[in-house]
């Protein structure tokens, strides 16, 4: 499928996501980044998959936008920490509670479990994770169960 067709049918997803997160200040920049990502996703989409193109694009673009927000916050934190200017250090630093919890969870997971959780949070389906990690679907299900068990045990 040509990207022009994909764009004409699905460009409203980008506008919806930007409106959903109340993006107004850097609207054009985020729009361009999401448009580039949409092109990349249109290249890797497999029509034979069970997921429709629109839901595939929406899910992946949504998580990509969240990743962009996280990168932007990390960049601000690095600038704040590296610059010893009194005006910068007087400003309060806000931590994303979600990121802090993920860091706590990652501490007690092994490498495969961390990779599974990272891919799962990025929106990949179990069969896609199995392909990426080169493991069987049953092994992926065991890893998922192990992660759930560890999370429940450590975060009661």
From Swiss-Prot:
GO annotation terms (biological process) = DNA-templated transcription initiation
Q: Which UniProt keywords are given for this protein, alphabetically ordered?
A: DNA-binding, Sigma factor, Transcription, Transcription regulation
A Pfam family assignment: Sigma70_r2
Q: Name one GO molecular function term.
A: DNA binding
Residue interval(s) of motif Polymerase core binding: 29-44
List where this protein forms a coiled coil.
Answer: none
- Name the DNA-binding stretches: 126-145
> In which family does this protein belong, per the annotation?
Belongs to the sigma-70 factor family.
Q: What does this protein do?
A: Sigma factors are initiation factors that promote the attachment of RNA polymerase to specific initiation sites and are then released. Sigma-S contributes to the protection against external stress, thus playing a role in cellular fitness and survival.
Protein's UniProt name = RNA polymerase sigma factor SigS
Q: What species is given as this protein's source? A: Staphylococcus aureus (strain bovine RF122 / ET3-1)
Which gene carries the instructions for this protein?
sigS
